[in-house]
C-alpha cells in the first residue's frame, strides 16, 4: 500500500543543526572516558530517550554513563537549577538532555559555571533565546533545515546516536559492535 514505509523512507541526518557538533563532543567524551550524565523527562518520550542513549552509549564503549530522570513536580521541568545541583553530585563532565532543555537558559548557564558542558536534544518549540549550551539538537530551531519538524524527543536522540555511530567509525579507540542498530 502507499502507506507502507520502510527504512529507506527514514529522514537523512543532514540538515539537523548541531548534530555533528554534539556527536563530536560525545565522541570526545567516549574516547577520553569522561563522565556522561543523561537528563531526561519522566514521561514515555523522556524515558525511551534515556534508555536509547544509555544503551547506545554503553554499546559504543562509554564506561561512565549515568542518567537522571527527576520528578518534575519536585524539581521542575527541564534542566532547572535544582536539577543541575542534583546532577553536580554525580560529577559529570557532560550533561546530555533528552526530551527537554530547550527552555533551560538558567540551568545550562549554571552547568557551564560549574565546568559542565551541556548538549541539548529536544523537540519542543524554542523560545526567542536559546540556552548557552555546547550544542542544541532540535529540529524546531529556526536555523534548522531538517526535513521533519514533527518528531518526538526520542527521535531527536536517535538521530544524535546515529550520527555518533556514523562518525565514530573514524575513532579507532571506540569499540563499535555490529549488532548496534543505530
Predicted segments with their positions:
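Glycine-centered small-residue hotspots that permit tight backbone geometry or close packing
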Residues: 6, 78, 101, 153-155
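A structured phosphate/pyrophosphate-recognition subdomain
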Residues: 34, 130-174
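Short, conserved micro-motifs enriched in small and acidic residues
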Residues: 1, 43-48, 147-155
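Conserved protein kinase catalytic domain
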Residues: 11, 54, 158-161
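N-terminal small/polar loop signature for handling phosphorylated ligands or for N-terminal nucleophile
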Residues: 17-129, 136-137
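Single conserved hydrophobic/aromatic residue that forms the stacking wall/gate
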Residues: 1-11, 173-182
Amino acid at each position: 500500500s502507499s502507506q507502507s514505509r520502510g527504512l529507506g523512507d527514514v529522514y537523512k541526518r543532514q540538515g539537523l543543526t548541531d548534530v555533528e557538533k554534539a556527536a563530536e563532543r560525545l565522541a570526545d567524551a567516549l574516547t577520553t572516558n569522561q563522565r556522561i550524565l543523561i537528563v531526561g523527562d519522566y514521561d514515555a518520550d523522556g524515558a525511551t530517550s534515556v534508555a536509547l542513549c544509555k544503551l547506545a552509549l554503553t554499546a559504543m564503549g562509554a564506561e561512565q554513563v549515568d542518567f537522571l530522570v527527576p520528578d518534575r513536580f519536585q524539581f521542575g521541568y527541564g534542566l532547572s537549577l535544582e536539577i543541575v545541583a542534583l546532577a553536580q553530585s554525580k560529577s559529570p563532565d557532560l550533561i546530555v538532555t533528552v526530551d527537554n532543555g530547550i527552555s533551560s537558559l538558567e540551568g545550562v548557564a549554571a552547568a557551564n559555571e560549574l565546568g559542565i558542558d551541556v548538549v541539548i536534544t529536544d523537540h519542543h518549540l524554542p523560545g526567542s533565546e536559546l540556552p548557552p549550551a555546547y550544542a542544541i539538537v532540535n529540529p524546531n530551531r529556526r536555523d534548522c533545515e531538517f526535513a521533519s519538524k514533527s518528531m518526538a524527543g526520542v527521535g531527536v536522540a536517535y538521530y544524535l546516536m546515529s550520527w555518533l555511530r556514523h562518525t565514530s567509525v573514524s575513532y579507532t579507540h571506540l569499540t563499535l559492535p555490529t549488532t548496534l542498530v543505530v
